[in-house]
Amino acid sequence: SRRPLNPGHSFLERHDVWDQFLNGLAKFDYTYSERIFAQIDNVLKELVKHPDSRQCMIMIWDQHLDNAVMGGKKRVPCSISYQFVHRNGKLNLIYYMRSCDVMTHFGVDVALAWKLLEYVARCTNMKVGMLYHNITSLHSYKRDWP
């Protein structure tokens, strides 16, 4: 099935990181995969129809859902958006994050972005280009260092 899992596989690997974010139903309020899944078909259609479009965006941040809970246990997502741009015969991905914990999340975030780029390129018969990754606050915590 193409339906995303909640919680996903990374949760199974790192309970110590993710348990604090589970809601009362033993799920996350959302996963990136769920938000990507809801938008990916529109991006694929747009790229096929208009390869040079500048509108191929996947938004992880949903202002109507996430702003309502700022300051509480739920938070604005660290990943904000993915933008796909076809330039010089290749599909590039511009990935914007407001914040990233380099020790516990960076590797998973980069892997997901790269796999997403490969998937969209394959579905649209485009060559894979560059991944541009912008992070406003890249940080680590003392608890994660030996």
Where are these regions (language model features)?
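Terminal, non-catalytic protein-protein interaction segments that mediate quaternary/complex assembly
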Residues: 1-146
